Amino acid sequence: MEAFDTHTGIGVPLRRSNVDTDQIIPAVFLKRVTRTGFEDGLFASWRSDPSFVLNLSPFDRGSVLVAGPDFGTGSSREHAVWALMDYGFRVVISSRFGDIFRGNAGKAGLLAAEVDQDGVELLWKLIEQSPGLEITVNLQDRNVIAGTVVLPFRIDDHTAWRLLEGLDDIALTLRKLDEIEAYEAAYPAWKPRTLPTS
């Protein structure tokens, strides 16, 4: 997973609340056996509308999604995070996230930045007044910068640390490799073992 420190990209105003994971990527797009290639399913039912924000320039090149409250609710669907990332998003800003979505985002390298709803409304206004406005999100300082506006965001310390270090679940496990190997070496010979295949 790529480490996340600071990201600057075009802001995309998604003026919708209660966006669940089925709206982010419908189930029909979940048949892949790989972890990439889900961008075509992102907001698929909404993208059929030519006036949908991701069909409009410059928002079609955005990488900072500014969404309404309760983004990513519903079923645990890692594909929702993967679809956002495959499309090019590195950050989603909202006043509230679904708990499972927030966890999946942090594990995959997508920053879910929680900003007060007044801050979200201000970002929408700024983006719509200046389409193509670049937003900078600084994880170290935990702030969002849009023009002269600086807004704090919330994220739990553990997820922030994982993102800053670029640690997915496998990388976290490998940090304990010495302890794992020591445990395996001390494991009694008379107990069952799982042996590597050759």
Curated annotation (Swiss-Prot):
Keywords, ordered alphabetically: Amino-acid biosynthesis, Branched-chain amino acid biosynthesis, Leucine biosynthesis, Lyase
Pathway assigned in UniProt: Amino-acid biosynthesis; L-leucine biosynthesis; L-leucine from 3-methyl-2-oxobutanoate: step 2/4
Keyword Nucleotide-binding annotated: no
Substrates-to-products reaction catalysed: (2R,3S)-3-isopropylmalate = (2S)-2-isopropylmalate
Top-level EC class as recorded in UniProt: lyase
Keyword Amino-acid biosynthesis: yes
EC number: 4.2.1.33
Membrane-spanning residues: none
Gene Ontology biological process terms, A to Z: L-leucine biosynthetic process
Entry-linked InterPro entries: 3-IsopropMal_deHydase_ssu (IPR004431), Aconitase/3IPM_dehydase_swvl (IPR015928), AconitaseA/IPMdHydase_ssu_swvl (IPR000573), IPMI_Swivel (IPR033940), LeuD (IPR050075)
SUPFAM superfamilies, alphabetized: LeuD/IlvD-like
GO MF: 3-isopropylmalate dehydratase activity
GO CC aspect terms: 3-isopropylmalate dehydratase complex
Quaternary structure and partners: Heterodimer of LeuC and LeuD.
Function: Catalyzes the isomerization between 2-isopropylmalate and 3-isopropylmalate, via the formation of 2-isopropylmaleate.
Family per record: Belongs to the LeuD family. LeuD type 1 subfamily.
Protein's name according to its UniProt entry: 3-isopropylmalate dehydratase small subunit
Gene (UniProt): leuD
